[in-house]
Amino acid sequence: MRRVLRSCISILLVLLLFLQTGVIFARAESERPSSKELQSVATAILERKKAEHGATPTDLFFNASFLQTAGSTAGDWYPFAIGRLALETSTEEYLAVLYDNIEKAYHKDGVLDATKATEYHRMILAILAMGGDPTHVGIDRSIDLLRDGVWNCVDKSGTPSLGKQGVNGYIWGLLAIDSMQYEAPDGAMYTRDMILSEVLSAELPRGGWALSGSVADVDVTAMAIQALAPYRDVRADVKDAIDRALNRLSELQDADGGFSAWGRSNAGSVSQVLIALCTLGIDPFTDARFVKNGSTAYDAMMRFQLQDGGFSDSVGGSYNSRASEQTLCAVTALWRMQNGMRCLYDLRPDDLGETPKVAFSAFDAKSMAETRALPTELTLEHRPTVLRLLYQLSATPDVSGREEAERILLSAKAQIDAIILELERLESEIAAVLYPFDALNLRDYGEVKALYQRYEALSVSNRAFLSDSAAEDLLRAKAQLQTELRATLIGAGCGLVVLCLLLYIVFHIRHRRRAQQLPESDE
């Protein structure tokens, strides 16, 4: 009887253990975000960014304020993610402003950036995601970012500079050329094999990569994996390097599922790891190497989410645009993997029969009406519209009234360029005159007053495009110096009154003494 009882108890315990295990698996599976949930996280990040640029939920994402950042880190990763999320939005104005900013950089320095090749690579990816062509940029389509940023990347002296940023330049160069499987042109300074070899040769002895030193850096290791992923199944040395890197990342993962850089858990590092795992097709929710104490990297990333939908770079921290954009890219990578689409940086069409995006639509009767309706006095709010119309015009061979449209649009562009130049100069001169702020004195009053007069000469709309810090500091400096001047004038006035009183007293005393010294007259 006892034996039967013990057997029953044993069977019951096994069943309970089995059921408990089943509950654990169900809970873990239930924590996997759905495609819709991932889209909601991404949308919340985008809405937070819109609010930062003064847009309401019903406004377009690409308003004039945001488009002023096109060509910067903050201005390119959001459009890239929007494109990779396949969100319906107008891309023409972003491409037009970005192309114009690139042309301005080339006209000024002859290059996009003389020291950072990764500037080219980021813009290449953003342009592709938005439906543009990074090999034909500009009104005359003469700028080739692949040529100048990868194949023949040199600094102003003509020295090869793809590796000037260390392994980072090679990593992002590889991501750029593999985004559409571009082939190196004849006579290229760098080839695909050369770049790949540079990345592999930078691997650390224990696995992984770093910009410097001998300790693997989570972000750089994750990005290297992203770049090497396309070669994993065709080259054994690449597969081995990736496997070592994955093991290293697993070792570096924090106990709560997150990842740290410089001893601090942060959103950027965990985002890069998630992108790397998705690029390899590794499920971050079930792969035991990347689940610590029941927490996944995704769980850790979501701890940085704020109530307004944005993300901080440290738990309990404030909103951080860089952390938000990296999280947005990670969420996009997860969304694409869950939907069976190409990985984040593979920008070839998901459907081979898909109609390619057209960067700029035709300049038609509606475009002509828009052109003729432009006001005489323009502001930077009109810049995206003017540039879009110009690029539409350049992309359309036969346009009725082309000369009229060109005259109006080129004149409008010249007016807008003059505003941009004045804002850039004003910003630069404010920095030169006002800082260090504590050293300001009345000798600077004339310069500060002149700067303020230029600020006042701007339209209210254009003033909004001056950085908040420059505008605030200019107003503060003016108020501070006016207060000092007022105090000085009051002090001088009081001093003058005192002096006049003293002179009056002295004169009066001397007058009385003279009167006392005069002899009395005889009568």
Q: Which residues does each predicted region cover?
A:
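Beta-rich interaction/scaffold domains
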Residues: 355-496, 500-516
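Sec-dependent signal peptide cleavage junction
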Residues: 19-33, 509-510
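Terminal, non-catalytic domain-edge segments
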Residues: 27-47, 297-300, 315-362, 500-504, ...
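Short, tandemly repeated low-complexity microdomains enriched for cysteine and small residues
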Residues: 91-96, 136-143, 186, 192, ...
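Long, well-ordered core segments of solenoidal/helical folds
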Residues: 34-62, 90-112, 137-160, 188-210, ...
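An alpha-helical repeat/solenoid feature that recognizes helix-turn-helix modules
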Residues: 60-90, 111-136, 157-192, 205-241, ...
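Bacterial N-terminal signal peptides that target proteins for export
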Residues: 1-12
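Bacterial N-terminal signal peptides
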Residues: 11-20
